[in-house]
């Protein structure tokens, strides 16, 4: 351990293979030499430092992640450690040590044989996804980049959210890479560069919900404007009252369109599933369903998991006041 309480990654973890590379840096599968050689996932991030050392925002974000870890929520990936690799006057290389899960939702969907994911499995996975998201939101943590690649699926079908609450930690690394972050799961308010909060994650959930049925993305745009156009082709052009006022792109830039039946794009979805999907894919974030409300949606009424006490994994609301609201 160093004086800042962070471990030295090169002393405890032995890299086995590189398992991913994205906008945020490289991800390695490694052995934890101090814990029986268990496999972990190492995410390496470069953080810009100044005369005062590591930015307060980064320290705060790490503190939030460590606080969330104390709850050991079943639908949130475990954060075992935060380590430093090396330091210079300009940057510190952080290594975030997470539990290792062999596959993400993208891999899972690719492997599923015809005719696709059973509807009851989709329902179960959606419930777990929403339960993990509600936990994050109850701590005022917005995921911001929810997509199948950072939803992990264990061999027993357990869903775990990964890569949440890391936007500030990753911001410096993102400036150094040319990797394009996918637009396909981004909410309209993000594409329009409007202000946003927790509802952005529910839009992403809607896109992922549809993809579980389709096994391919619902909206596949090539730019912010193209992505928005593809969204409006399906859900229709919203009224003037629902268009955000703090954006440069006016509603008039898009042709007037009516909403198309969602079952045209998402076959095999039942009426209750369709209702939940449309509540997630609501253009106006103020009218979009919350994760907490979605857990009580009639779509889940026949799911055995719903009989469990949802509050058993939720922190007391009064404990969120000291947490990061960014």
UniProtKB/Swiss-Prot annotation:
CDD domains: STKc_CDK6 (cd07862). The modification Phosphotyrosine is found at residues 13, 24. Transmembrane segments: none annotated. It is an enzyme of class 2 (transferase). Its EC number is 2.7.11.22. This is Cyclin-dependent kinase 6. The keyword Secreted does not apply.
